[in-house]
Amino acid sequence: MEERSSRCLEVGAGAKRGQGEWITIDMNDACDIYWDLRKGIPFPDRSLNKIYSSHFLEHLTFNEARGFLEECKRVLVPDGKFLICVPNARIYLEAYVKGEPLDANRFFGWAPAYNHTTKIDMVNYTAYMDGTHKYMFDEENLLFILGANGFRNPRLRNHDPELDLQERAYESIYAEADR
């Protein structure tokens, strides 16, 4: 029987340090491991039980995201869990199409748009975050991308207050899948 690791990895964690079983990785000196995840995940095959990604995948191009998801599968143990949340493009696009005001306090409470002179400027800011966002997601394409990259049983999940940031709850899609 294969020995299962007790390690869990949070990718794109920013300045956050891991606690308990969690290890953090990002291009930030304050996290546990400083690493560019576009170059792979520096762990052996089948060495992690869980990977958690919060508002990271949208910072990769489509092809970079495919490579990243392949790496996640590689380092997860069989039946390991991949948990993810990404910005929900639908809320911004629906507000735009319906002509609803894109209130900076509602849509950008954590960082006001630097240029919100028109509604489409606010949508563009959300989509590209001054050039740091490379891809937009809705529920359908997030689940499709997980399945297309070989994850089993991709499904939506609820916001988990022990894992997910409360300030991201309104704007996020939450999903999980099995290796």
What are these regions (language model features)?
Residues 1-5:
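Conserved alpha-helix/loop element of class I SAM-dependent methyltransferases that forms part
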Residues 6-94, 175-179:
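Conserved SAM-binding loop
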Residues 64-71, 77, 81-178:
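S-adenosyl-L-methionine-dependent methyltransferase catalytic module, highlighting the catalytic core
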